[in-house]
Amino acid sequence: MSQEATIIAVDNSDYMRNGDFFPTRLQAQNDAVGLICQSKRQRNPENTIGLLSLANTEVLCTLTNDVSKIYNRLHLVEPKGRIIFCSSIRIAHLALRHRQLRHQKMRIVCFIGSPILEDEKELTRLAKRLKKEKVNVDIINFGENETNEQKLSEFIDTLNGKDGTGSHLISVAPGTVLHDTLMTSPVVAGEDGSGMAGAGLGLEFGLDGAEDPDLLYALRVSMEDQRMRQEHEVNGDGSNTSVVATSLPAGSGTSEEAMLQQALAMSMQMNNTESSSLPMDIDLAAMSEEDQIAYALRMSLQQMGEETTQPTTTTLESDKTIVEPSGVAMDIDQTPTKVTENPNLSSSSGTLAAATSAVPTSADLDVMYDAEFLESVLQSLPGVDTQNEDVRKAINALTKSQSQRGSKKDEKEDEDKQNS
């Protein structure tokens, strides 16, 4: 697109204190100026923008491509006095004639929020001169529509001439949002409405992507994360949901985008792993008596093993602390040692000797798998009939497997003795 030099003339009269545009006319005007600056910069980065006040006809900021300077000067504007329309437009034209890039087209964007004191003849003479100098003027009329509508319409018609294009008059009714109205107007969207489409996502969230790309990218990522979370809640089936690679909008830096996608995928995998690692409910009613007995014995042995696997701490007189698992025999010096209890362990763990004595030995296992011992344990359980055929089969199976293991162990010890 062609390059353009634009002077934005803002109304800073006392009428701008009115609250028919939320929160005030002045604040609504400032938001609209920010929108126009963003659209101009999005169309062409070589566009330059200046700022002028109508009440005291002061050039607040000369032509620049640094939008932050416009914002800084704009927030210093205070309402006072009345506007001088014709003199302000002439000064804006003079500032445009002194632009550095002569090939830039000249345009004035003027906000009118108070009555215009000049008569129609003076406005017509000014319009003819601007047309001769090839200066386009866009006027946003808000707040005082009935008073200024006729004058401004003739002014714009004189500027456009027979072509009828180039300059625009936008009248905004009180009570509406000035920023939203300009979004679809020719001032921002252009003659054919392609200005906003060409700007892409630059005006998303009301931010200029060229000014703060990191903040814009963070907002996009946050919105995408929220969208994924909502879709996950709608689908519902968290256990059957597979991890899908997230497609995020293009941002500043592909490496950061890839890391973010990886982090989101890992987070979803961790959630699925945590849900799958939880113990499943056991339906005891669906199990046979033999399976119930085997399950009860297995849980009892597992609980006993967990209680005896806590580490113990042995403190030697040489100020060396050795942490070792319970039940592991170690060859140490005959130097007198002192056994201390780890304060982090429960009081029931006791000393090292007490902990090692809790580990089941081969003799203890023989007793546990003894048929009479199992019958006595099962008789103490409510609802268990030891004379039941299934119960007898389960006891015989457990004792038989233990006896087979013991015989194999004895055969191995005999072979080792013969080899030695």
Curated annotation (Swiss-Prot):
InterPro entries: PSMD4 (IPR027040), PSMD4_RAZUL-like (IPR049590), UIM_dom (IPR003903), VWF_A (IPR002035), vWFA_dom_sf (IPR036465). Residues 210-229, 255-274, 288-307 form the UIM domain. SMART domains: UIM. GO terms for molecular function: polyubiquitin modification-dependent protein binding. Residues 1-174 form the VWFA domain. Residues 392-420 are annotated as: Disordered. One of its GO terms (biological process) is proteasome-mediated ubiquitin-dependent protein catabolic process. GO terms for cellular component: cytosol; nucleus; proteasome regulatory particle, base subcomplex. Residues 407-420 have a biased composition (Basic and acidic residues). Keywords: Proteasome, Repeat. Pfam families: UIM, VWA_2. SUPFAM superfamilies: vWA-like. The 26S proteasome is composed of a core protease, known as the 20S proteasome, capped at one or both ends by the 19S regulatory complex (RC). The RC is composed of at least 18 different subunits in two subcomplexes, the base and the lid, which form the portions proximal and distal to the 20S proteolytic core, respectively. Binds and presumably selects ubiquitin-conjugates for destruction. Belongs to the proteasome subunit S5A family. This is 26S proteasome non-ATPase regulatory subunit 4. It comes from Schistosoma mansoni (Blood fluke). The lineage of its organism: Eukaryota, Metazoa, Spiralia, Lophotrochozoa, Platyhelminthes.
